[in-house]
Amino acid sequence: MSTKKMAEHETTPKNGMDPHAIAEAVRNGMFKDDNASRAMGMQIEEVGPGYARISMIVRSDMLNGFRICHGGFITTLADSAFAFGCNSYNEMTVASGIVVDFLAPAYEGDRLVAECHEVSRAGRTGVYDIKVTNQHGKAVVVMRGRSHTLKGKPVVNL
């Protein structure tokens, strides 16, 4: 993520901690209890304020009857990136809605990468765009997520 893009998202935390350190602490705390993402073999490659990049390899048990990756698995990858992106400020945040567009199939062995970017964060509402690409950089899914922050509930104790 570019420095300019990152600066647009950063806010000064009340505790004075570095925003990137907060995002890393949240990632570690969330991922250790995220059985779904871990069971699907997801790897969290990078997190930052309002940002996350997560990858997974499409396995045979993720294929549908057409021998392509079931859309639910790709959506789950995008949703996990969304979760790590919108919770990166250490304020417990949940999805209030998503819209998913399937652009291309993914196949067994494909390496999919979901990248989440914050579009807007105002009050307790956020909007995030997530793009899933394959190992060739081809867009497979785009998703827009709306989030709702739960007042006064940190993700991890810092």
What are these regions (language model features)?
Residues 1-158:
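Terminal targeting signals and extreme-terminal segments of soluble enzymes
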